[in-house]
C-alpha cells in the first residue's frame, strides 16, 4: 500500500525495543506514498511536517486543520497527513469548509503508478468550485495522502 513501517504505523515501539536490546535495526523500504505525494504536489520541497492521522471528531479535526494552515503561514512548510480510507470524504469536506480560499491543497490517491493513481493540487476555492460542478473525486475507501501549503 506504499506505506512505511513506523510512519503512522504501530511499529515504532518494536523498533525502539530492538535498539534497547542492542539488535541491529536495518530499514528496508519500497516506494513511500508520503514522499511520492510530496514530490508530485508542487508544494514546498524543502520543508514539511507530517501529522499522521487527524482526529476523528469533526470539531477536533477542523481545529487541527486550521492549526496546520496557520503553521504553514508562519513557516512556509508543507503540511502532510493521511486518513483512514473510509473517512477521506469527510476529511476533504472538513478541509474545504475551514481552510482559507487561497490555501493550496493536494489530494494524492492510490500512489502506485497504476491506472487508479490520482494526484491534484488546487487552491481550496478551486476545489470547492470543482465539487460544485460534480468534478470532485470520490475518495471513499481509497488510500490517500493530503498536503497543504499557504501561498
Feature-to-residue mapping (PLM):
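Conserved Motif II region of HX4D acyltransferases
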Residues: 1-10
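Class I SAM-dependent methyltransferase SAM-binding "motif I" and its flanking Rossmann-like core
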Residues: 9-71
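Thr-Gly-centered strand-to-loop micro-motif
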Residues: 1, 51-52, 82-83
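Short, catalytically relevant binding-site loops at active-site mouths
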Residues: 3-4, 32-34, 55-58, 86-88, ...
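A contiguous loop/helix-start segment that scaffolds small-molecule binding in enzyme catalytic cores
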Residues: 11, 74-151
Amino acid at each position: 500500500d506504499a506505506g512505511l513501517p513506523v510512519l503512522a504505523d504501530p511499529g515504532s515501539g518494536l523498533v525502539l525495543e530492538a535498539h534497547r536490546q542492542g539488535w541491529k535495526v536495518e530499514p528496508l523500504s519500497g516506494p513511500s506514498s508520503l514522499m511520492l505525494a510530496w514530490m508530485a504536489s508542487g508544494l514546498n520541497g524543502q520543508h514539511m511536517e507530517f501529522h499522521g492521522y487527524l482526529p476523528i471528531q469533526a470539531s477536533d479535526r477542523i481545529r487541527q486543520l486550521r492549526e496546520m494552515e496557520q503553521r504553514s503561514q508562519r513557516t512556509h512548510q508543507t503540511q502532510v497527513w493521511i486518513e483512514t480510507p473510509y473517512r477521506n470524504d469527510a476529511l476533504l469536506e472538513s478541509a474545504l469548509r475551514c481552510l482559507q480560499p487561497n490555501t493550496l491543497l493536494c489530494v494524492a490517491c492510490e500512489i502506485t503508478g497504476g491506472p487508479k493513481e490520482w494526484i491534484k493540487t488546487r487552491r481550496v476555492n478551486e476545489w470547492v468550485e470543482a465539487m460544485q460542478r460534480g468534478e470532485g473525486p470520490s475518495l471513499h475507501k481509497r488510500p490517500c495522502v493530503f498536503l497543504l501549503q499557504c501561498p
